[in-house]
Amino acid sequence: MPYSYTEKKRIRKSFAKREDVQNVPFLLATQLQSYLTFLQADTATSDRVNEGLQAAFSSIFPIVSHNGMARLEFVSYALGEPVFDVKECQQRGLTYASPLRAKVRLVLLDREVSKPTIKEVKEQEVYMGEIPLMTGTGSFVINGTERVIVSQLHRSPGVFFEHDRGKTHSSGKLLFSARVIPYRGSWLDFEFDPKDVLFFRVDRRRKMPVTILLKAIGMTPESILAHFFDFDNFELKSEGGMMEFVAERWKGEMARFDIADRDGKVIVEKDKRINAKHLRDLAAGGIQRVSVPEDFLYGRVLAKNIVDPDTGEVVAHANDEITESVLNAMRAANVRDIQTLYTNDLDRGPYISQTLRADETADQMAARVAIYRMMRPGEPPTEEAVEALFQRLFYSEETYDLSRVGRMKVNSRLGRGDDSTGPMTLTNEDILETIKVLVELRNGRGQIDDIDHLGNRRVRCVGELAENQFRAGLVRVERAVKERLGQAETENLMPHDLINSKPISAAIKEFFGSSQLSQFMDQTNPLSEITHKRRVSALGPGGLTRERAGFEVRDVHPTHYGRVCPIETPEGPNIGLINSMALYARLNEYGFLETPYRKIIDGKVSDQIDYLSAIEESHYVIAQANAALDDEGRFVDDLVACREAGETMLTAPGNVHYMDVAPSQIVSVAASLIPFLEHDDANRALMGANMQRQAVPCLRPEKPLVGTGVERTVAVDSGTTVQALRGGVVDHVDADRVVIRVNDEENVAGEVGVDIYNLIKYTRSNQNTNINQRPIVARGDKVAKGDVLADGASTDLGELALGQNMLIAFMPWNGYNFEDSILISERVVADDRYTSIHIEELTVVARDTKLGPEEITRDISNLAETQLNRLDDSGIVYIGAEVSADDVLVGKVTPKGETQLTPEEKLLRAIFGEKASDVKDTSLRVPSGMTGTVIDVQVFTREGIVRDKRAQSIIDDELRRYRQDLNDQLRIVENDQFDRIEKMLVGKAVNGGPRKLAKGATLTKAYLADLDRWQWFDIRLADEQHAVVLEQAKESLEQKRHQFDLAFEEKRKKLTQGDELPPGVLKMIKVYLAVKRRLQPGDKMAGRHGNKGVVSRITPVEDMPHMADGTPADIVLNPLGVPSRMNVGQVLEVHLGWAAKGVGYRIADMLRDERTAQAKSVRGYLEKVYNTTGSSAHIDSLTDEEVLELANNLKKGVPFATPVFDGATEEEIGKMLELAYPDDVAARMRLTASRSQAWLYDGRTGEQFERPVTIGYMHYLKLHHLVDDKMHARSTGPYSLVTQQPLGGKAQFGGQRFGEMEVWALEAYGASYTLQEMLTVKSDDITGRTKVYENIVKGDHVIDAGMPESFNVLVKEIRSLALDMDLERN
């Protein structure tokens, strides 16, 4: 495979044993695809499918008025262009959204005519609110912040059968139940009680016998019994009767009388059990009917009503038990043939018959009234109301919707095939079939459903969630429209008078702004963004709650394989409820997760890839990805490890249907980034996956020496890097932008053949980390579509780089790495390896107050000159100023209310003038504990307020940048066009031209070069055709210029119009500070294997343990952190990292040699490194220059990829170590024979340690838990209102709680004065603490403790219990 522009520069050596059959799919496809389908913005109206907005509109419209004389029909909708782009929305705090306009038609019918005739039709476009748009990276900008809508994993609509696991009844009897869950509408439950009577309930209300529901849908007791039971046929005799003999019904029963054959020979004696031999004898005897005694009939249940043939009178009802009197009545009425229900105790229970007895309703109407009373207790049941309610429950499309998924699940569970054909409401057949399946379950046939099976849980994505909200808004609109439609004809209203878009906007706004599933995007680094968008949550509206979710829901299920990651999930209360999609997983049309498999055709593994959902997968036998194959793709082993229906087994290759696509198929993105994951304990892998998302981007990102090969995919798919949209040549590069002249073949005619990529510079992320893009191409480079042009935060040459590669030694060091502490060399800090930039946004607003407007100004009294020096004339800090806590950033004064003045103040005012004191200083200052550099200032001014100088200069800068972009585009377009014109003109004959060009002369290059290029258009060509082409070229150039001028004007208009600010705000100023955070003790760090720790000390380089050649270790870790935690992956990573670095050193040595032989020797060595083991790299496809550039990039270490579950073996690591450290080098560095340990020396004494130490390189991360954010101290500060105790927490500038255990400690030491001070003046003794403060100021250190306020609170609380408690004061 050919390498891309960036891959060539640094090829990652992979240890994978298998070729990739399928590339990792685009990681944000689920989100983007779902929202695209929801909007269908670029689809022609006629081609739109019934999904998303289209579905919502067509389900609500047409809206018909109450009298049916007017209706509002939906025609189509269109989305407008958003006013501001993503970046502008973020700056201005706006929502990135498009206006939605729907074309609706108002149809009025003629009242005068008997049959419906249309009187008039009015069509109009109506504004329906704003619909937020998704950015290219799958997030939304809502009120200026980036948010993500997390997908929800909920229980799929359909029918489910389960039992209570014997928990309800003390006997431990299994009570079966069924539940029909629609997408929207009432839930219908069926359940058995301990007495085996079957009940139903609607929406978890009071339960009623199920036969009420059956009667309500139009069944009679006879038809109910006929539906659920088989019958026994009897012919009555004067004594006893004859029974039709059905052999299988007698097997295993006790004979209650002698059974004889035709000749009267007794085959089964009384009280004997009937076995198979007896039945064979009876069949051989040709017995069709058996004579039964009278008492055999008693207790049987009639299947049908018994009617007297003469009088028509009902002698006995269906479901009546046969007694002596009933038999006599039937004989008296000359009834000969009767049918009874066939039941037994084993697998034909009489449940429906018993239920029918418990049901007291007589007919269909009575049954429906009973249901009405249950649903609407206390309301009088009129016939219309009863009918309407019953229809609305399950049969009306407005109130009940199974959805396609629900219909498909119902059909497949009730055994009607897997398609979604059928009505979207419930049918009588559905209800009957469900009850039938439930009764069969109770009879011991069939299986209950597993709720946690991924075939019974589906994913609702952004599009679907947004559609539901939009529909909810439309329903509110529908009610209002129905009211007004009646007036439409009388008042001559237009559609826009009827529709109010507020409810829609409100519903959408509420969903995107404050829904549980709309989350503030985790933007610490590219991985956290991508993981957040691939997250699947079981919480949220219509989902589970943390408190109610049991162990089963959270547990890993066999169907998670390849669909949901078994590793990555949060620790804590949400464990197992929030999951991450697996690497290759995708959603099918019904919203079920699918995973890809390779199909096996005739015993051969093909490259055909099929996606299977959890339900489909259960029908196949699937081999693992690491099964050994021969060259033809046949299995080598006689027995292959496979999975079938969740069970693992060994089977013959002939039985296998599919094979996994890749070993990393089962894990998520974050877990697939952990090298040697297969050697880590799952708990630690979970922590590793979670902590990578918290890694802070370093100042200089460094690729991991040991990766897994997924790094490039993550970096590119996350959108942090800049990718070329079209191939071409780099025309211009600077730190801010990359300009590319597009290849002719990729350019569309009439478009500008220039792509300009403006890079994001020092921008704040949601977590205050720094997003900054750096170009990695040079002028003149040829790039192809999709190549990486610029690195973003945490990426290095287009690969994810979350941390730094550190030289790590595993050894104890003076207790400084006790309990996971980390000892770090000062060199790491000096080299800024873990320095990160954090950007803080500070905002100040100038409001219009009752006493007058606040003013942004430099003119502030009582401010030192040093403070004012940083402010410009407008009172705003300069960019580049270095500021620390309490420095003024923006000067602001607020008018102060008039106060009563003392005579002295009046005198002073009279002498020194009025002005100074009627305003107070409310400037924006740097918060405590923060120092940094001002990197950007933005000023927003309300429409109609005069801009200050600073705001104007910001706008001018922005316009200058934009003009430069346009000029670049124009320059390239013009050069391009003039090159083509020159080619056409040279050698052509002319009729004349500038500089007295003679008629008939031929044009030369020299002549054209002398002219100004715009004068070329004045040349009169002899050939008419060419003259036309020349004229067209001139027109097209002038048109382009005009287009660019228009674009500039548009931009200028946008920038100079006033900003939309909250009511009452005149100006808003945002100041951005860049804060440099160096590594310091107290910062949390971690590797990728869950090996986390806190920096305990930063030690001078000279004190660190060092190697024989003087190389000091960067980090010293405690070896005891490895064995008990079972994350051995970190040790293997260290070994492989050591090899990677060593190979880099060898390459560097070669490059130091003479230039000539370099390429050849380097090429030979690289072949050895890349192609001895693992998958091969195509070094031979590179030119000598490319090989040398590659070698130069590899000097600091060759990056290795050891894919998850398919990584480097111990043997391969050993081979690499030998390549990296030949014997002479190993001896010089005093490495052990295996090269995996080295003899180290104590930096302080120079002595050798007593045993060799494991040393090597590990990719180590600095996490977002920085001590700077947590460090906090309080002198005096705010107090709680009721208890008057100091508040807690850094945000409230609170104190540290002196809790009861601390009090015990002081009591134990007898430190009574300290204790008194803690509980009174330092806490809630109001008078005491003011007194102490005064005393300290005077230099008098005495405390005078009084009554703590919380004691008064206690007294008040006791009084509230009506106990009058008072203190005796002496």
UniProtKB/Swiss-Prot annotation:
Protein known as: DNA-directed RNA polymerase subunit beta
The gene coding this protein: rpoB
Top enzyme category: transferase
Family: Belongs to the RNA polymerase beta chain family.
Keyword Nucleotidyltransferase: yes
Keywords attached to this entry: DNA-directed RNA polymerase, Nucleotidyltransferase, Transcription, Transferase
GO CC annotation: DNA-directed RNA polymerase complex
Enzyme Commission number(s) from the entry: 2.7.7.6
Provenance organism: Bordetella bronchiseptica (strain ATCC BAA-588 / NCTC 13252 / RB50)
Any one GO molecular-function label of the UniProt entry: ribonucleoside binding
Coiled-coil boundaries: none
Catalytic activity: RNA(n) + a ribonucleoside 5'-triphosphate = RNA(n+1) + diphosphate
Known function: DNA-dependent RNA polymerase catalyzes the transcription of DNA into RNA using the four ribonucleoside triphosphates as substrates.
HAMAP family for the chain: RNApol_bact_RpoB
Oligomer and partners: The RNAP catalytic core consists of 2 alpha, 1 beta, 1 beta' and 1 omega subunit. When a sigma factor is associated with the core the holoenzyme is formed, which can initiate transcription.
UniProt cross-references to Gene3D superfamilies, sorted A to Z: 2.40.50.100, 2.40.50.150, 3.90.1100.10, 6.10.140.1670, DNA-directed RNA polymerase, beta subunit, external 1 domain (2.30.150.10), DNA-directed RNA polymerase, subunit 2, domain 6 (2.40.270.10), RNA polymerase alpha subunit dimerisation domain (3.90.1800.10), RNA polymerase Rpb2, domain 2 (3.90.1110.10)
Pfam families: RNA_pol_Rpb2_1, RNA_pol_Rpb2_2, RNA_pol_Rpb2_3, RNA_pol_Rpb2_45, RNA_pol_Rpb2_6, RNA_pol_Rpb2_7
Any one biological process term the GO annotation gives: DNA-templated transcription
